[in-house]
Amino acid sequence: FSFVPRLRSPKLWRMDKLGQSVSPLEVIRNGNRKLHAVGQGVSYPGEDGWLALNTLDTALVAPGERCLVNFNNRQPKLAKGMHFLLYDNTWCTNFPMWYEDDACFRFEILFG
């Protein structure tokens, strides 16, 4: 699921990590800048408006680009939005290569 709103200051995106509001741009060099586990979700506290995208069923979010195994030290391009990983079997081990059941992933979008 990708959420790419037009924002005046996309560098203001924040993620809820262990109950703390963290910028995706504050990840140290050689840290994982591409994929994060979030608690409540992500938010944008901009002058042009406030929004929160709360995830109720999935925790993994890729800021900037949909990239699962692209590990590099470049900062994410936050104007490209937030992308939530709903299902994956990149590794092809210990899991079937398909999903036989129905799935439901809920999100809550708040504006202010």
PLM regions and their residue ranges:
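C-terminal (or distal) subdomains of carbohydrate-active enzymes
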Residues: 1-112
